[in-house]
Amino acid sequence: MKKLTAFVLSAMMVLSLAACGAKTETPADTSTPAADATKPAEVAKLTYAVEAGSAGEEVALANGYNVVSVDSQAKALMEVQADAAIIDSLMAGAMVGEGTSYPDLTITDQKLTEELYGVGCRKGSDLASFINSVMADAYADGVLEATAETYGVQAALVEQPASEFTASESDSDVQYIKDKGTLVIGITEFEPMDYQDADGNWIGFDADMAKLVAEKLGVEPVFTVINWDNKVFELNGKGIDVVWNGMTITTAAQESMECNNAQVIVTK
């Protein structure tokens, strides 16, 4: 298993922390707390921008940091509302540096925790087993790593064990999806996992993997933007077939959805 370095954005280049970012579940038993929870003096003096309602906000508050809850951490830095921003390492790498929206921000390498990213299907769905088999084959033949390299997340990949698809004996979700001819993928915009290119096409590591699964199913991929808080409702109501958008695999997620084997480990 490879681990990705954690990041924090810092306008003043004084300190770095990293934590979870947009649209993820609250960290549970998949998270590893910081090795040293004691706040040094310089940490106590700083104000950190965190996404309102995110796991990053929860981790920061648990560590006793001064926070300002915002919709855009990087924007808060540029407007001098905060000294640093807590955000997950994948998103930080995509939005900071030359050629990005925030070229003047810097990234540093102290971490708070780690999370596993995966996919959520309807509870009891055999689609999770199908996805595991596709990911295992993609890992074995190098497609998974090549796709990860395209979006700069190769260091975060989790090794995929060999896996064979086991179809449900009755009420097969895989057969339902094949019969209707589409795989409806619930997403939010979360670069580098799911985002739109200049032509409005959905791309990203998760988006490309979802397209691969749709190809193996012999159906068309359909991306639909969802309200993240309603993802389980959307699944159960068959408005979508899968949640595939940098989703943290937590105990709560596993209780309400059928989750696949994690594909990415993200340092916070």
List the predicted regions and their residue ranges.
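Short Pro/Gly-enriched coil loops immediately N-terminal to beta-strands
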Residues: 108-116, 257-268
